[in-house]
Amino acid sequence: MNSKRGMFTREYLWRSIVTMCGLFVIVITLGIGGFLVYKGSGTFLKFHHSIGEFLFSSDWAPVDNMEGGGKVGTLIFIVGSLSTCGLALLIATPFALGSAIFMTEIAPKFGEKFYRPVIQIFAGIPSVVYGWVGLTVLVPFIRDIFHRQVGHSILAAGLVLAIMIFPTITSVAADAIRAVPKDYRMGAYGMGSTRWQTIYKIVLPASASGIFSGIILGLARAFGEALAVAMVDRKSVV
């Protein structure tokens, strides 16, 4: 009886601790959101800028004084972010999915011992390093290829972001594919399916939700990497 009561007490204690931690995170998140709303509302309430101007105007020339004024159109930044992240996903996703299939289905021993650690190392490289490589290598390359005066562009930013999110998508997709039960593969082979038929018709559909989660995580990282994008894209387009 005492042992059961002790187990119940410990379970209740740990459940309370986890609940408080979760509530703490929620409160902090709401506090950050409230602070941003409070500070940003002055743009509309105090300086009388409209939401339509803020969202649908491309004129960005704010005035740094107590009276406010200027122009605060963010459309160019919204379109630039969406274009850059979309281009990065289009470039990175096929290569990441192919790499995940290679390291789990084609060469699992090589993938586990060599390829996976390399991917994890690339995932831990700071964004400033990617931005510096893009600035010193990719930007001059694009300038020479397209005969532009300046190589800073959405193409350069998209390529840098694609390289940055490639390890994230690859790692999550590989884990999702690896989690597919072995019985699925054995059943497909028993019915006469080839390796590629098994991968395409059995493994990928079974791991689709995990692969999609990897793509979403890659997209989230792409939206958050402002430093690398700022180094290679200066409001110009290809």
Regions inferred by a protein language model and the residue ranges of each:
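Transmembrane alpha-helices
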Residues: 172-173, 195-233
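Generic hydrophobic transmembrane alpha-helix motif, especially the helices
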Residues: 120-158, 162
